[in-house]
Amino acid sequence: MALALMCGRRQLLCLLRPQRQFHSVAGPCQWPRKPLTAGLGFPADRCLGHPRYVLLMAPGPRGLSTSAVSFGEAQVPAPPVIPATPPPTAVPEVASGEAADVIQAAAEQSFAELGLGSYTPVGLIQNLLEFMHVNLGLPWWGAIAACTVLARCLVFPLIVKGQREAAKIHNHLPEIQKFSARIREAKLTGNHTEFYRASSEMTFYQKKHDIKLFRPLILPLTQAPIFISFFIALREMANLPVPSLQTGGLWWFQDLTLSDPIYVLPLVVTATMWGVLELGAETGMQSSDLQWMRNFIRLMPLAVLPITIHFPTAVFMYWLSSNMFSLGQVACLRIPAVRTVLKIPQRVVHDPDKLAPREGFLKSFKQGWKNAEMAHQLQERERRMQNHLELAARGPLRQTFAHNPLLQHGKNDPPNTPNSSSSSSSSNKAKSKQPWRDTLG
């Protein structure tokens, strides 16, 4: 019994020990196989009287080869091979501001769709602004400034001509002031002879030297249509409004369709306009040349400030650009080399004793008001005298003596005798209250 058990244990240990013959090899599988216990019989004569069998239900973990392919796995089709996805190509980065500008330009409506732009002066300016903004890529404030500089460059020849005339007037200013003083005194005193004599002499002097006092003022007036056209064009664009104009500003005035929230632009424009007029950047005549012009120039910027303070910032952008161009222009035209190239006469420095004394603003204003009142009184008196003369020429002759000299007096009574005087007074007693009704003939 003990020997049989010992033999059975040895056979069992042999079965449990990993062997090469128990490894499955790759290849077609042959089923059914012989039972693993077919050769595991134990002889009865050694162990027991009847045979014993041991069945191994599962192989050990080292009994299976990792390179084996089972029958079930051989029947399953291999999955399709999916090619690896290539990495995305590098896309050049675009700045956010440029991308926004491109998108906005693509989505922005044209001025023709918005009802702006035409062949009128206002429409042509709007078309030019649209070209600067859309085609050249300038922001709205830059487009307005560029169009302003372009317009000012076109009228620059007229400004140069005005500078020439202003230089002539300044060089002959002492003689002009003398003639003006004579004319003013003759007008105040009512001396028509002296008035016409001084006026004729002044006219002859101006023709001799080719001087026209109002020519420097007329030439810059050609800029008035340009300014009005720019003003109307920008105001229409702001009132519509153009969508991109609401974000085309600068610094604190990003929205060009609204007025300046802190009123900096109106004040700066007023200050620059005063400097332009005071320096004579447009006319070439400094404010010290003519007294009445100096007073008018100093009052005009302050007078227009309450009217223009609520204008859209797009209008102020044009106005500020124009004023800055004018200040740079007057600084450039004061260079002697530039004046020589442009054939502008040099300004003569006059002796202060030969010029009329300058008065203060209030004193000159009061004197001018007084002179205007006196001139009005003289004109009123002349008008009344002229009316009396016309009435006397059209109406009947008025009697200017006590009796009618055409009446025949008595032969014995001379005209100056008491009888004649009594007879004449008795005959005209009824008409003595209204002697002017008597007429000759």
Swiss-Prot record:
GO terms for cellular component: mitochondrial inner membrane; mitochondrial membrane. One of its GO terms (biological process) is protein tetramerization. It is found in: Mitochondrion inner membrane. The modification Phosphothreonine is found at T400. InterPro entries: YidC/ALB3/OXA1/COX18, YidC/Oxa/ALB_C. The modification Phosphoserine is found at S364. Residues 405-441 are annotated as: Disordered. Residues 418-429 have a biased composition (Low complexity). It is a multi-pass membrane protein. Its main location: mitochondrion. Residues 1-113, 161-212, 282-298 are mitochondrial intermembrane. Belongs to the OXA1/ALB3/YidC family. This is Mitochondrial inner membrane protein OXA1L.
